[in-house]
Structure formats: structure tokens, C-alpha cells
């Protein structure tokens, strides 16, 4: 009996650390604790609020010495103190050695007290009362994989001279040889970053190795908080070589020695998929200014189309260091002629320099785009541009509206242009901005002194914390059923790096873990009506606020947001759903594509990463592999919660986000993002989703693999198989069906000379072991 009393006392000491001591700093006299009969009603009431499983899980995570049987007994003891007198007997039978168990509890009591007091309340806040949408069983979906980032390198190790990059992709034989020599497959292309439909063709553009963009200040470096990563680092999912990379030394270092750190950033690619033929062309331009601008480019973040011209644009790479080199890269393509018109850095739009772009919008037959700009007075802010050009002179843009924030999203609602503003420019608030009524002739050019558009909502009105609003951005504007919807992007992967900058040296300390959990945010989801009345659909009634900037104390408080969510908690109920990245209306329903960061946490927690903090957070939050990958949600009614079409990236857990939607015919095309360059199915994917208007079931998705990529280059066409198999033949026919040429493949490629067909349109048929693909081609 004495042994049990000691056990109860030790347990009570740990339990009360989270219940009473955190409230009034009360202490418990262990000598007065005789057993369950001594538990006051006040304490038992508080204990009822403590979820047993999560409390014991915290103790287990923070002390791996706690064996499974011990944790079962500990769970029984907690339940016993709550008044469940049968729970203890059931658990005690598995732990006959009470003395050994008491030693473990003593150890835990000495070590875990600060974690129970500082970490456990935030842990409970994050995990409790979360429900997620149901799976959609009311429609039939057919989902095909149309294209995917090629394996374009075999990675042998950081700085290894054998790490040779081939943007056209490697053959099956080359991949097999590299694997046999101890290498790993690598997908350098990460995001399908911009996408647009032109008739029956889908155009898209990419970025590469996104977690490494910006060199050592890149987003992925937050997985190594406080460490020097300038020589590169690697975990089980991705690698950044930085200044050790051979590509950087040969390409970026040739421009300036300081640019070697951008070794992981390759030239982005541009593709065109013909939905009628099933063939995709790599239309990336080359030579002269094209090469220069593609090299000095973080990636092509956007694609837009109007009056025969397709635009691709993105921020400069070397400009990410700020200063005079800040700029952008834009490319114009003649969709009718099938050739590029030119490129431009957009550095002089009436004296204003464009530094970033994300979205385009066509309204009343007028093309607009939203940008970040350094205006001619040197101010960093946002602008809406209108296109006045044509194929002969595509670079005619005018500023038709100013905003205090970078224009990240834009669309027309209720006769006005609405903007999703990012706090990356002068106005450090993420917000929704409303422009003036759009006249019949469209928005007109304005001078630099024209008043900025009105801000109607800010994220800071919801989140009162001092830090998290700075990395939570407006995302995905979409009009649906008479209201404007948007989500948020919570760049939570930067939190570990922020913790290091805030002076936390030991990332496993209770203070550091509390900082990481307290700053963690999930995407909230909103809508507004024509009277600017804002509703919170998914979000929080309370959010953690860090007290140190206010009082100097490293503590946390839950503060009311002023909103009550209609459908559930932020993240659509998921802890690591950080981004409502893009939206589209399809068959009258609202589709929402997300980014889920669980696989990022898993990678950072891997053995190669070496930071125990990530593993602790992973174990606390219950990260599971079956949840890896983006979510796609379908909203059929504004008054009902959405349902999941998928919550695991269509079965590809490495695809962590949906970046783009576009409609072509009766299909929804989905462009995904994955920065996991060392994973077998890493890199971007292009999916096609077809949904019957009326359906009764969800069928297992079928996958249609892309057959052929091709690229025109120097009077020739280079064909390569999308899956790496050998090309058997390439046949050329005239439009009457007569054979003009048959060429045999060389491995997974085949090149034909197009000089004999100059000025003609022919039919080309490519045959591989997997099938054949035919298309008309004009030369």
C-alpha cells in the first residue's frame, strides 16, 4: 500500500504541474496524499479536462525510457485519479515491478515538469477538437497522370563531380547504371508554378529545387536551425548542395563568385500539352537573352494568355539578394505560330521596375496582372498592370492601380478588382484589397501619386500574435455563388529558423518547443459578400499569443480572435494543412487545393537531419505517412462543409501541394508541387480530373502515363520517352498519309532533321515499347 501511495504521489505531482501550478502556482503536499480519497473535487474537475492519452504521450515522447507497459500503467493511474477506479487494476497487471516503475516516474518527474507546464497546454490546444471533412462519395472521378517531372540527374553525393544535370531527362538505362553505381534518382524540377489553357492546349512553367532557392537563406535551411549549411545538407527527401554544387560553380559562379550558393537553381522549363494528341512539347526557349534571363530566374511563377500571346513570368534569382539586381524575367509566346516572341525584365514600366508576379486575370476582354514593384520613387509596393500590347509589341503594360502590398492574387468580384495582398512590400499586413468599380473600357492608367486601393480586411484583425501574421499570407481568391472566397498560406516551415534567431540554443528545451507549437498556424478559410461582410469558414476562436514582446516573459496566452468558424478548425481540421493554395469553379462546384506539410516535418525529423526537435513535434502531433500529400476538397453548397476528393496527393505522398488549376474542355487540370528532389515520385505532376455531373460512387483512379516529350532545337526535333523506355521509331507522314521518313531511336531519344519539312505541316508518329503517339507538327 505504501508503494502505491508513493506512486500516486509522484503521478499527482506530474499531473498537477499542468492543472493547478500553471494557474495559481499552487503546490501539492505529497506527504498528505494517501490515495484517490485525497483528490479534491477541484483537482478532479481539472483532471477531467486533461486527455489521458495526450498527457501520457507527452511523457513518452519526452522520455523514451518509459516502456509500453509503464505507459499503460501511467494511463491507468491518470484515469484512476479521474475517478475510474477499475482502470488501475486493468493496467497494473502488466507492470509487476513497482519499484522499477517508481524509478522511471521519479526520473520523469524531475525532467518533464517544465514541459508539462510550458508545452502541454499548447500541445492540447493544437490537437483537441479537430474534425476533418468526409471523403466525397457522391461523385465519380477519373484521375489521370498526364505528365511528371523527369528524373534529370543521378545524385552521388554533395559536391560530387558525377552529379550531371540533363533537363530532358535520363533514359531507363542511364538511371539503372547510376543506381548500380550507388547514386540516387533526382528530380530537379519542383513546382508546376504557372499554368494556363489555350484552346485544346495546356501550358505550364516550373521552378527547380524550391527549398534551396535563395541559397543558404532558402526555406529548406530552416530544417537545420542555427547550423551553417553553406556547404550543403541532405535528408531522406531532398538535398541542397549550395556552394558545393558543381552546377553552381560552372553556371552561376561564372556570373559572380557570390552566386555559387545558388547551385541548386536550374533554368525553369516551359511545356505545352496537346489534349488531342497526348503529346507534350518542351518549348523552353534557348540562346542569347533567353538563356541569360532563364538562368537569372528563381522560376516561372505565373502564366497568362490573351489575344494569341502566352506570358510566363517570375522573379529574378540574383535579385533575391536585393539591391540593384532586383528584377524579374518575362517571356512572350505566340500560341498561333508556336514560337517565342521575346523576353523582357520588365524593369521600366513608366519608370517602375517589376520584381515579382503571381497571377493574371482576363475581364471583359482585357488582360490584367498583379505584381510587386519598385516604383520610380524607390518604394516597394504592389500594382495592377493592364496589357495594351499585341504580338508585334507584347511589352506594353500600364499601371492601373496601386496597393500598399504585393499583389499576390487578383480577381473581379461585384464589378471591382479584388486583390490578395502579401506583407512582403511596404505595408506589412496580409490583407484583402478592394479596387474601384471597373468602367466599361476597363481600368485606366494612373499616375504614381494616385491613392492606393482600400484595405477591407487584414489577417492581423484575426491573429493578434506579434510574429505569425508576418509569415501568413493571403491565398487563392475565387468567386463562387455570389461571394468571394480566399484562404491563407502559413509558412510554418520557417518557425525553427525563427526560433534560432530568437536566441533559443537548445531546440528541445521546453521554451523552444513552446515557441514552435505556439507559432504554428494552419490555413484559415474565409469569404466576403458584396457588402464587405467577412465570414470565417474554417479557423480559430482563440490563437496563442507570445507574451515576450509584450511583457518580457517567455510565456503564452490564448487570445480571442473575434471570429467564430462556421465549419471547423483551421487547416480544414488538419494540423499541418498550411495553404489553401488555389481554387477553381468546376461543374458549378468549388474545388480547393491545399498544401500539407506533414512530409516536410518527417523529412526534417529523419536521421540524416539530426535535429531531435523535429522528431519530438512529429511524435507529439501523430504524423502519419498515410496523410502525406495535398488535399483536394469539393464544395457543393455554400451552406455545407466540403468533402475530400483526396487527402493524400492521389496516393503520392511526396506531392505536398496543388499550385494551379486550369479548365480545358470538360476536364479540370491540376498542377502539383513537390520539392522532394530525392524521392522516386518527387517533382511536379500534371493531373487531369474528370467528374460526372451526377455520380453515385468513387472509383479507383486510373493513371494514364504521358508518352512523349519533344523539343525543337536548331532545325531539329528531339523526342524522348516520358517514362524512360527506348524509342523504337519516329515516322513522318504527309497529310495524305504517305511516308516521308522513318528514323530509329537511340535509347530513349530520337532526333529528326526538320530542314526538309520547312514550311510544311506533317504528321509525326512516335512508337515505344509502351505504345505510340501521333501529332501534326508545323515547321
Where are these regions (language model features)?
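N-terminal propeptides/leader regions of secreted preproproteins
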Residues: 24-127
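Short loop/turn segments immediately following the C-termini of beta-strands
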Residues: 207-209, 315-317, 372-374, 422-424, ...
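Hydrophobic h-region of N-terminal signal peptides that target proteins for export
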Residues: 13-21
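Sec-dependent signal peptide recognition
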Residues: 4-10
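Trp- and S/T/G-rich repeat-edge/linker motifs of beta-rich repeat architectures
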Residues: 110, 114-190, 210-298, 305-309, ...
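Entry beta-strands of beta-propeller and related beta-repeat scaffolds
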Residues: 201-204, 307-313, 317, 365-369, ...
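C-terminal outer-membrane/trafficking sorting elements
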Residues: 699-779
Amino acid at each position: 500500500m505504501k508503494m502505491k501511495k508513493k506512486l500516486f504521489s509522484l503521478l499527482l505531482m506530474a499531473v498537477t504541474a499542468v492543472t493547478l501550478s500553471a494557474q495559481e502556482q499552487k503546490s501539492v503536499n505529497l506527504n498528505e496524499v494517501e490515495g484517490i480519497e485525497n483528490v479534491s473535487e477541484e483537482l478532479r474537475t481539472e483532471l477531467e479536462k486533461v486527455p489521458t492519452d495526450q498527457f501520457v504521450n507527452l511523457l513518452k515522447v519526452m522520455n523514451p525510457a518509459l516502456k509500453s507497459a509503464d505507459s499503460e500503467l501511467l494511463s491507468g493511474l491518470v484515469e484512476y485519479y479521474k475517478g475510474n477506479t477499475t482502470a488501475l487494476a486493468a493496467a497494473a497487471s502488466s507492470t509487476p515491478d513497482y519499484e522499477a516503475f517508481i524509478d522511471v516516474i521519479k526520473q520523469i518527474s524531475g525532467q518533464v515538469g517544465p514541459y508539462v507546464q510550458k508545452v502541454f497546454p499548447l500541445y492540447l490546444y493544437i490537437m483537441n477538437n479537430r474534425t476533418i471533412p468526409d471523403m466525397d462519395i457522391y461523385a465519380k472521378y477519373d484521375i489521370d497522370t498526364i505528365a511528371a517531372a523527369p528524373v534529370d540527374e543521378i545524385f552521388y553525393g554533395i559536391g560530387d563531380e558525377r552529379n550531371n544535370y540533363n533537363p530532358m531527362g535520363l533514359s531507363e538505362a542511364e538511371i539503372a547504371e547510376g543506381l548500380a553505381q550507388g547514386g540516387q534518382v533526382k528530380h530537379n524540377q519542383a513546382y508546376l508554378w504557372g499554368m494556363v489553357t489555350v484552346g485544346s492546349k495546356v501550358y505550364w512553367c516550373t521552378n527547380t529545387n524550391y527549398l534551396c532557392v535563395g541559397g543558404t537563406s532558402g526555406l529548406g535551411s530552416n530544417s537545420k536551425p542555427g547550423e551553417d549549411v553553406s556547404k550543403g545538407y541532405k535528408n531522406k527527401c531532398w538535398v541542397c548542395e549550395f556552394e558545393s554544387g558543381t552546377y553552381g560553380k560552372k553556371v552561376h559562379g561564372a556570373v559572380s563568385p557570390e552566386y555559387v550558393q545558388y547551385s541548386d537553381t536550374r533554368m525553369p522549363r516551359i511545356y505545352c500539352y496537346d489534349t488531342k494528341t497526348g503529346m507534350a512539347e518542351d518549348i523552353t526557349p534557348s540562346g542569347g537573352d533567353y538563356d541569360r534571363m532563364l538562368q537569372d530566374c528563381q522560376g516561372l511563377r505565373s502564366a497568362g494568355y490573351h489575344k494569341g500571346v502566352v506570358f510566363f513570368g517570375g522573379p529574378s534569382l540574383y535579385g533575391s539578394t536585393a539591391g540593384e539586381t532586383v528584377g524579374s524575367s518575362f517571356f512572350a509566346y505566340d500560341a498561333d505560330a508556336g514560337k517565342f516572341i521575346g523576353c523582357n525584365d520588365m524593369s521600366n514600366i513608366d519608370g517602375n521596375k517589376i520584381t515579382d508576379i503571381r497571377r493574371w486575370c482576363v475581364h471583359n476582354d482585357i488582360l490584367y496582372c498583379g505584381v510587386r514593384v519598385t516604383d520610380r520613387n524607390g518604394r516597394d509596393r504592389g500594382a495592377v498592370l493592364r496589357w495594351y500590347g499585341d504580338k508585334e509589341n507584347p511589352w506594353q503594360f500600364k499601371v492601373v492601380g496601386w496597393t500598399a502590398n504585393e499583389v499576390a492574387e487578383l480577381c473581379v468580384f461585384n464589378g471591382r478588382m479584388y486583390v490578395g495582398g502579401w506583407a512582403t512590400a511596404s505595408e506589412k499586413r496580409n490583407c484583402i484589397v478592394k479596387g474601384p468599380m471597373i468602367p466599361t473600357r476597363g481600368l485606366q492608367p494612373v499616375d504614381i501619386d494616385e491613392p492606393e486601393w482600400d484595405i477591407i480586411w487584414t489577417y492581423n484583425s484575426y491573429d493578434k500574435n506579434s510574429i505569425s501574421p508576418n509569415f501568413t499570407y493571403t491565398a487563392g481568391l475565387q468567386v463562387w455563388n455570389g461571394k468571394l472566397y480566399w484562404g491563407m498560406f502559413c509558412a510554418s516551415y520557417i518557425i525553427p529558423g525563427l526560433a534560432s534567431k530568437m536566441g533559443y540554443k537548445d531546440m528541445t528545451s521546453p521554451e523552444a518547443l513552446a515557441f514552435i507549437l505556439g507559432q504554428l498556424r494552419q490555413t484559415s478559410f474565409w469569404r466576403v459578400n458584396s457588402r464587405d461582410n467577412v465570414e470565417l469558414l474554417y479557423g480559430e476562436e482563440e490563437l496563442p499569443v507570445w507574451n515576450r514582446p509584450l511583457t518580457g516573459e517567455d510565456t503564452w496566452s490564448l487570445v480571442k480572435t473575434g471570429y467564430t468558424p462556421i465549419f471547423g478548425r483551421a487547416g480544414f481540421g488538419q494540423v499541418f494543412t498550411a495553404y489553401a493554395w488555389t481554387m477553381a469553379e468546376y461543374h458549378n462546384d468549388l474545388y480547393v487545393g491545399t498544401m500539407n506539410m506533414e512530409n516536410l516535418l518527417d523529412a526534417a525529423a529523419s536521421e540524416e537531419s539530426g535535429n531531435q526537435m523535429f522528431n519530438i513535434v512529429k511524435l507529439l502531433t501523430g504524423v502519419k505517412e498515410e496523410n502525406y500529400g495535398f488535399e483536394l476538397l469539393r464544395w457543393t453548397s455554400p451552406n455545407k462543409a466540403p468533402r475530400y476528393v483526396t487527402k493524400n496527393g492521389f496516393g503520392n505522398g511526396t506531392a505536398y501541394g496543388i499550385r494551379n488549376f486550369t479548365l480545358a474542355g470538360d476536364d479540370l487540370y491540376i498542377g502539383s508541387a513537390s520539392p522532394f528532389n530525392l524521392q522516386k515520385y518527387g517533382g511536379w505532376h500534371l493531373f487531369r480530373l474528370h467528374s460526372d455531373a451526377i455520380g453515385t460512387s468513387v472509383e479507383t483512379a486510373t493513371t494514364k502515363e504521358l508518352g512523349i516529350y519533344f523539343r525543337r532545337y536548331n532545325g531539329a526535333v528531339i523526342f524522348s520517352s516520358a517514362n524512360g523506355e527506348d524509342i523504337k521509331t519516329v515516322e513522318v507522314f504527309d497529310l495524305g498519309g504517305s511516308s516521308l521518313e522513318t528514323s530509329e531511336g537511340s535509347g530513349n531519344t530520337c532526333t529528326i532533321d526538320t530542314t526538309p519539312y520547312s514550311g510544311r505541316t506533317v504528321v509525326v508518329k512516335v512508337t515505344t515499347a509502351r505504345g505510340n503517339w501521333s501529332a501534326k507538327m508545323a515547321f
